[in-house]
Amino acid sequence: MIIRIVRMHFTEAGVDESLEIFETNKVAIRNFSGCTHLQLLKDADDANCYTTLSHWTDAQSLENYRKSELFGKVWGRVKTLFSERTQAFSLEKFIEL
């Protein structure tokens, strides 16, 4: 399993539009082949900072999503709303208690 974390800082004016984009596309993203979990997290201290947390069955499933028309449509709109460069991480579970 791959855990994907993407931390995004939006312009103040871009927050509402980014939330609309997520709301419109969240079901399609969650139902994309290989996606088993999807969350949007809001930073506790920064109202313009959000993080997506998604689980993928394997790295190829995530890569297929990143090359998909859906990703191109969503990311193409969202990236214009950022106030700074995003931080993205792909992780594997190592130890779980």
Go through the PLM ranges and name each one.
Residues 1-3, 13, 27, 72:
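Residue-level marker of intrinsically disordered, low-complexity segments enriched
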Residues 27-36, 55-89:
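An amphipathic, aromatic/His-enriched active-site/gating alpha helix that lines ligand/cofactor pockets
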Residues 9-19:
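Short, surface-exposed ligand-recognition loops at beta-strand->loop->(often short) alpha-helix junctions
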Residues 2, 39-46, 76-97:
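Glycine-rich beta-strand-turn "strand-cap" elements at beta-sheet edges
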Residues 2-9, 39-66:
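Short, well-ordered beta-strand segments in beta-rich or mixed alpha/beta enzyme
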Residues 15-17, 49, 61, 97:
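Intrinsically disordered, low-complexity acidic/polar segments
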Residues 10-12, 58, 92-95:
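Non-catalytic surface loops within mature trypsin-like serine protease
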